From Swiss-Prot:
Motif 'KMSKS' region location, chain numbering: 268-272
Name of the protein in its database record: Tryptophan--tRNA ligase
Family assignment from sequence similarity: Belongs to the class-I aminoacyl-tRNA synthetase family.
GO BP term, pick one: tryptophanyl-tRNA aminoacylation
Short motif ('HIGH' region): ranges: 89-98
Organism: Encephalitozoon cuniculi (strain GB-M1)
Catalytic activities: tRNA(Trp) + L-tryptophan + ATP = L-tryptophyl-tRNA(Trp) + AMP + diphosphate + H(+)
GO molecular function: ATP binding; tryptophan-tRNA ligase activity
Subunit record text: Homodimer.
Lineage: Eukaryota, Fungi, Fungi incertae sedis, Microsporidia, Unikaryonidae
PROSITE patterns linked: AA_TRNA_LIGASE_I
Cross-referenced Pfam families: tRNA-synt_1b (PF00579)
A single Gene Ontology CC term: cytoplasm
Amino acid sequence: MAEQRITPWDVEVVSTDEVPVAIDYDKIINQFGCEKFNQALADRLEKLSGKPAHYFFRRGIVFAHRDFNLLLDEIANNRPFYLYTGRGPSSKTMHIGHTIPFLLCKYMQDAFKIRLVIQITDDEKFLWKSMRLEDAMAYGRENIKDIVALGFDPKLTYIFSNVEASHHFEENILKISKTINLNEAIKVFGFDMSSNIGQVGFPAKEIAPCFSSSFRFIGKGAMCLVPAAVDQDPFFRLARDKAKALGEKKPSSIYVSLLPDLKGVNRKMSASDPNSSIYLDDAQDTIRKKIIAYAYSGGRKTLEEHREKGGDIDVDVPFEYLKYFLDDDQELEKYRSGYIKGEITSKEMKEKCVVVIQEFVSRYQESRKRVTDDDLRAFIDINKF
């Protein structure tokens, strides 16, 4: 029997089984009340964009949505929309799991040439973590550079620190705050008597960018699309609940599954555990050592048993990483089917994972080296619009 805990601050599947139990995303869809993403939506997106759908859509990594069909209607009718996502800076460098929503945003921005706002929740990390405010802000600035290195268009992208720039939409923060009573906040976010009042007030800040009126440079009435990890859904569910009272359009959202940490598919990768995460500044040999030593395998106890029964693909972390970072569908299928049949061993799966992750991180690091303070200023400058 497994129990899932999915909140913006805690993701884990607790089970009495010896083998880690993967997160049940169908259960999340039912629990959160969102809709399952389907191939028809991916096909329509592809038709409207004129570009092949990102493999995140094809592989079920984008697994759920809220009103994405209505967002596609907006696109079909040439009505404006924009993207919104965020990052909570808990470490100086992001890990590979943090890149997933941003890679999705990059695809959408490239496909539709649309504006993107990225919220850096340095205030949230200060309020929830044992962290100095100065450190949270410093991590935020470094994380902005990490994000810039992914290749966004500076003319279409605004990245902002909540501490430094949320005053630009303070009016909406106040309006949203007034619509949420304490009982509702406790129910949605799990606050209790130990929660500080800063934590209780924070959700209004994450909700505010869902509404185009928070940004003067975005057209009035533009619909917001939020690509995000599913653990952030409580914020956007509440945003949709309050939209009518605020006279705003409900935001649409698409949710990606959570990249597991190295030690098991039952929890997401966390920056707080260096042995369970692969950071974007990890050296090539460090990546190799982490995957070989720590990546949980679905292989059998002996090679003979593995050849006979095949590997357990559902709990194999190296294969999960291939799903996210190997863009060749045919090669991915070769490793999936070969592993299930026992033709590909756990060692071979890990070796392939090492190569793919090393290549991704190496390309990223070359881009990150080129990011300057001037680049950072170009992305955080609200006056450019």
